[in-house]
Design a protein with these regions (language model features):
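Extended, folded cores of ATP/NTP-driven motor/assembly subunits in large transport
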Residues: 1-404
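P-loop NTPase motor domains
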Residues: 53, 60-79, 90, 253, ...
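Hydrophobic anchor at the beta1->P-loop junction of P-loop NTPases
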Residues: 441
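Conserved lysine of the Walker
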Residues: 449
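Hydrophobic positions on the alpha1 helix immediately C-terminal to the Walker A/P-loop
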Residues: 452
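Post-Walker A helix-loop "phosphate-sensing" segment adjacent to the P-loop in P-loop NTPases
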Residues: 459-469
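A short helix-turn-beta junction within AAA+ P-loop NTPase domains corresponding to the substrate/partner-engaging
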Residues: 485-489, 698-711
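Conserved P-loop NTPase
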Residues: 726-777
Length: 777
């Protein structure tokens, strides 16, 4: 037998003691503050958690790259340690879900909508997979003391994290309470919310940590076990097929049940593996030689070597070739699985379903007889292995059991965006948790862009204390804003609503003198009013001087009282001696005292409502460039005010491509896009004209830097551009090609997942969100 395996079995051999209590079933002897468990006489273990990656929806080339990178990870495993890969399916706790995601009623007029939204969320949670899949790596090693183990885990952990990072997966080490929570949640289904463990408090009171995690009762039968009122069964993979598809692990763990699957891996040092393979090959060749000698003695000189002997020789040569020339390692592995159910009938039915799935892949699972306790301690991420049903594999054949499938997006206190098409889990995302929470919603007309934006607006209006600002060029949001109690500001040359272009608060300057920043804005405004020609140095100096002058009294009064207007600014220009000042005053007269003076009057609308919609449908061609600048500046005013109050602001800009048609509004928007994050604000751009949008270098940069993108059904040319810009595979592209409304891809940080968002039509909220004729309010 191979020396590595012999010494491992010797180390793992322990004297069997009959458990005197439920606590004795758990094989952990000692726990330490840094997440290390002692699980044997000199055996220590440490668990790491890693995130899923988009393997199932990757292109063939990407899959190959991921497979090879995962093989590299397996090759890097230390031959002196045992590595356990665990996939843990745990059911989403309804109480936790309600606490985290349902919207609390506040007793106001919006409660009817909150009840409707909560009912939708609960229906989706019930219909969804409602299974959260966690993935772990547990390393166990024999060391003389915990200090040696600590040093070892620090080194191995750094390598492990680096390898997972190259795969695009985030790997973190688990603390003691996090490891205990895994065990607690498995043994005490339905009591997840009650788990609380403080290691210092436990020691102080002299309590046993096992009391916090073990079930009330445990009974082990011949081929199943019972913990409390639940039933469980441990299986192991007995027979492997010659060829296994890389989707087998994903299919086995796709069951909507609490289950755990573990693969224990024992790598063999290459020199030892090569010696063993050469010895086996020599044995096969000796058998062939002996057979031929016997045939020759019988004068049977033309006899061909039996097929099975030839096959053995061929396979051993291939195996040796893998080890010596193809960078493969020899690995011993054991695959075990535990699943639980509420009744024995359900357990038997689930077992049969798992056996059928394995048979489909020409593999054979078997139930452990009289070894259920040993099997349970093998499959769970303690770091122990009590089942020795080893199978010899190469790195490549072991990598087929790839633990990756698809990323799920599940942020605490996030917003519901739909269901993951592959895992069927709910997509709950919080843009505030991203490095750059700005968003784009892209799709053809009728693809569900406005619906997606309104869904987000409704959630923010009902569940948060954030302010919401909408720029609406198509008058699509008015019914929703009215229903939510917001303010609609109609902006046009003939509208009675006015916004003062020179509105400014003390926070406008980002800590510096706000007039300096406002002066820049007035210069941009004047360039637009004069006709888009660049201002000369003289003109800029005059504008800067006049801006400082008109704001002087307002600043001296501590930003209280009447704010100056563009009319005051023009009057100040006329007081200057330079002829250039008179020219500027004449050029802007149409917009200060003429028929387009809507932005030269005092603001007479409530721009401080929690929900403000700027309706710019009637803004004519002449007023559009200046109108967009003034609206964006008004939004900047609001954002800076909210920052001082510690309040978040969400800005939704429909048909954002309109803003990129004007140089100044495009540049202003680009600056806003970069700066809003530090102000606690988040911008969203909505458009169907992706091709037009990407013609602008500014827009292209903004899109590439946005970490949150919702892509719905796309036109052919737009798909090609998006695929290039965001590195989308052909398979992923199929989710934004000729799909129904509300279906597509959602990019959250580095995750890109296919989603579907179907909202119940028999609700008031649906009527407020839909733009289909005859369905709206």
């Amino acid at each position: 037998m191979i020396k590595t395996l012999t010494s491992l079995l010797k180390q793992d051999k322990e004297k069997f003691t009959v458990p005197k209590g439920v606590q004795d079933v758990i094989p952990v002897k000692t726990i330490y503050d840094d997440g290390i468990f002692r699980v044997g006489k000199d055996k220590y273990s440490k668990t790491f958690k890693f995130t899923d990656i988009n393997y199932a929806v990757a292109s063939r080339e990407d899959k190959e790259a991921m497979f090879l990178e995962y093989s590299e990870l397996l090759n890097s495993l230390d031959s002196g340690a045992t590595t356990k890969l665990t996939i843990n399916n745990r059911r989403l706790n309804r109480l936790d879900f309600e606490k985290s995601f349902l919207i609390s009623e506040t007793g106001d007029y919006l409660d009817k909508y909150r009840r409707e939204y909560n009912k939708m969320l609960l229906d989706k949670a019930t219909g969804a997979n409602s299974i959260v899949q966690d993935k772990y790596v547990t390393i166990s090693i024999n060391k003389k003391n915990v200090e040696d183990a600590r040093t070892y885990f620090a080194r191995v952990g750094a390598d492990l994290i680096a390898h997972f990072s190259r795969l695009g997966s985030k790997c973190v080490e688990l603390e003691t309470d996090e490891r205990l929570r895994i065990i607690h949640d498995f043994f005490r289904v339905g009591e997840e919310a009650s788990f609380h463990f403080d290691i210092k408090e436990t020691r102080k009171k002299g309590h046993d940590f096992k009391d916090y995690i073990c079930p009330d009762t445990m009974e082990f039968e011949k081929d199943y076990f019972k913990m409390g009122d639940r039933f469980g069964r441990v299986l192991f993979l007995r027979e492997y097929a010659s060829y296994i598809k890389d989707s087998m692990v994903a299919e086995l763990t796709d069951m909507n049940r609490n289950l755990m699957m573990s693969i224990d891996i024992v790598p063999v040092p290459t020199d030892e593996a090569v010696r063993e393979a050469e010895s086996r090959l020599l044995g096969v060749e000796t058998n062939i030689t002996n057979w031929q000698r016997k045939q020759n003695q019988n004068n049977n000189f033309s006899a061909t070597v039996p097929y099975d002997m030839e096959q053995q020789k061929k396979e051993m040569k291939e195996f040796l070739d893998d080890l010596t020339t193809r960078d493969q390692r020899m690995m011993f592995s054991v695959l075990t699985m535990v699943h639980t159910a509420d009744s024995k009938e359900q357990l038997d039915s689930d077992t049969e379903a798992l056996l059928t799935t394995a048979r489909k892949h020409l593999c054979q699972f078997a139930v452990l007889k009289y070894q259920q306790m040993d099997g349970l301690n093998t499959v769970m991420p303690f770091g122990t292995r009590k089942i020795d049903a080893f199978r010899t594999l190469t790195t490549e054949s072991l990598a087929v059991f790839i633990p990756f499938r698809v990323q799920d997006i599940y942020h605490e206190n996030g917003i519901y965006y739909g269901q993951n098409v592959i895992s069927k889990n709910m997509i709950i995302a919080d843009r505030k948790q991203l490095l750059n929470g700005n968003e784009f919603i892209l799709g053809v007309s009728g693809g569900g862009k406005s619906f997606a934006a309104k869904n987000e607006i409704i959630n923010l209006a009902l569940a948060s204390d954030a302010d919401i600002i909408i720029i609406d060029p198509e008058r699509e949001y008015s019914p929703l804003v009215k229903a939510m109690g917001g303010e609609i500001i109609n902006i046009s040359a003939t509208s009675p609503n006015h916004i003062n272009a020179m509105d400014m608060n003390r926070e406008y300057g980002d800590g510096a003198n706000p007039v300096i920043l406002k002066s820049e804005f007035i210069m941009s405004l004047c360039e637009q009013l004069i006709g888009g020609n660049n201002l000369g140095a003289k003109q800029k100096s005059i504008i800067d001087r006049c801006t400082a002058s008109v704001y002087r009294t307002y600043q001296q009064n501590d930003y209280q009282g009447t704010v100056p207007t563009l009319q005051d600014f023009r009057d100040e220009l006329l007081k200057q001696d330079e002829p250039e000042a008179k020219e500027i005053a004449l050029a802007i007269e149409l917009f200060t005292h003429g028929s387009l003076n809507t932005f030269a009057k005092q603001t007479n609308v409530d721009t401080n409502s929690f929900l403000v919609c700027y309706d710019i449908l009637d803004l004519g061609k002449q007023l559009m460039p200046i109108g967009m600048l003034v609206v964006l500046d008004s939004i900047l005013n609001r954002i800076t005010q909210n920052r001082a109050k510690g309040r978040h602001t969400f800005i939704f800009i429909d048909e954002i491509y309109l803003l990129f048609q004007h140089e100044y509004s495009a540049n202003f928007l680009f600056t806003l896009w970069k700066r809003v994050r530090k102000y606690g604000a988040y911008a969203s751009g909505i458009t169907q004209n992706v091709d037009d949008l990407l013609q602008s270098h500014t827009a292209r940069t903004m899109l590439a830097n946005s970490e949150f993108i919702i892509m719905l059904n796309q036109a052919a040319t737009d798909r090609v551009e998006l695929a290039k810009l965001l590195n989308i595979s052909d398979l992923q592209m199929s989710y934004i090609t000729n799909v129904e409304a509300g279906h597509g891809l959602i990019k959250v940080g580095s995750s890109l997942v296919p989603f579907a968002n179907r909202f119940p039509k028999n609700t008031q909220l649906y009527k407020l969100m839909t733009t289909k004729p005859g369905e709206g309010v």
